């Protein structure tokens, strides 16, 4: 990371350990933003750029990440129960210890994602669709 990149990162709002439940972040550029330990239950991240974001230990149950770019995000030990991840780009994420129960994943791209084996198997049973941004099938991206 160069000096210019660090300066850009410092301009981002830090949402660490905050309550963002039902917050509206639709379409926003939140690349490299920290939501570590944040509560974002029911929040709207539809179409947001969350590339490289930190969502570690966050609670995002029932949140809407439809069409969002979550590539290279740190999403470990987080709650994504019932989350809408349809058509989201989740390439290269680290999501070990996270829960994706009842998440909607049609068209999501999980290429090179680090997931718990049990989550991967469960998601494979629900995998359907092709990501409109990357052209990759959800089933294939999960290595099913």
Where are these regions (language model features)?
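Tandem repeat scaffolds
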Residues: 1-143
